[in-house]
Amino acid sequence: AGPPTSADLRAAGWAEAVALLAAASGEVGTVTSPEGGSATAEVDGEGIRVTVRCGDPLDATVLRSYCVGAAHMAWSWVTSESLVVDDEGVVHDLTVRSFDVVRATETPPIEVTIEPDDGEPCNGSDAVFAAVAAATWLTRGAPETWPTGT
């Protein structure tokens, strides 16, 4: 049972595959989403640095905001988020606070570079999400369990 979910959610399924491939190869490289957006990410003690290419942005400010949000979501997903279940695997608390989402003020600085591209606009933030998740996990040494701790 459990809460309802969907494969339509941000990078569901393929972001995990990207992280596993990065752990196996020891590097993230360029991540390309099914929609065609691509991203790279570096994570270290200085912060999170992202490049994104996803066609000619409709609005660069909005794209940058989506990418910052995706990077924050990925960092939090790998380092602190979890669901608490009972002995039967039933979730009893689905509040934002119960997920242990990293507060924005506790997230490393995020730098986004939008690479020039005159192609048709497409979703780039999902590629950012997957790239940052993989880079965060690699930076942590690819431990066997998530969350890895902040």
Regions of interest found by a model, annotated:
Residues 1-150:
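C-terminal catalytic domains of large/alpha subunits in multi-subunit enzymes
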